[in-house]
Amino acid sequence: MLKWIDTLDIAIELYEKHPEIDPQWVNFMDLRQLVIELEGFSDDPEKSNEKILESIQLNWIKEKE
């Protein structure tokens, strides 16, 4: 079960599920929705914030490199 604090695991899941997406161009609203739609995500959608989303995005960019 993924929670917002699992930023690296979320990034890996996003990379595996959406290899066609370049994460550096994903805005935070879309990123939030992509995370919420992950099969293993089970946290409160309202608990996300800019710091968490930025961490997910940076980890996703690193995974893609």
Question: Whereabouts are the PLM-identified features?
Answer:
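A charge-rich, low-complexity, intrinsically flexible signal that marks solvent-exposed coils, linkers
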Residues: M1-E65
